[in-house]
Amino acid sequence: MAESLNRQRVLNLLDMVYAGDIEGALARCTEDIDYLAPAPIEILPHMGHHRGRDEVRAQWQTVHDRHSQMRYEVRAIVAEGDAVAVHLRVFLTKRSNGRIMQFDTAMFFSFRDGRVSRISQIIDTFDLVQQVLERDLSALLMGSPSL
C-alpha cells in the first residue's frame, strides 16, 4: 500500500512542477530536500546539487523562466517501500525561440514521513547540451563541420 501511495505522490508532484505550481510541489517535500542532477551547470544552471526548499524552488523557477511550455510522459514507474523510480520523456519549449527540446530522464525519489526527501536525476547531458546550444557537439569535437 505504501508503494501505491508513494507512486501517486510522485505523479502528483511532477504534475505540480510541470504546471508551475512550485509552492504546491515544495509542500510535498521535506524542508531539507536534497536534489542532485549532475550536469554542466555553466550551460544548465538549474542542474547540479540543491539542498533545501529555497534552492529547489530557485531550480524549478529557473526551468520555468527558460521555457514557455513544459510537459512529460511517464515511460515507466516503479515503487518499492519509501523509494520510487520513474523514467520520463520530457518536452520543453524554449522561451527564447520556441524550439522544442525532447529528452529522456530517470528520476529516483526517496520519502521520509510521507514527503519527498531526496531526488536524484539522470539525464544524457551530452544530448541535452546539444539541444540547449542548438549545435552538433560531435562534429565540433571531431573537427567536422556541423550539418
Task: Please name every model-derived segment.
Residues M1-E31, L137-L147:
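Short, low-complexity N-terminal intrinsically disordered segments enriched in polar/charged residues
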Residues V10, L14-V17, C29, A37, ...:
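Hydrophobic alpha-helical core bundles mediating ligand binding, dimerization, or RNAP-core interactions
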Residues V10-L13, A25-L26, I33, G52, ...:
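Hydrophobic pocket/interface hotspot
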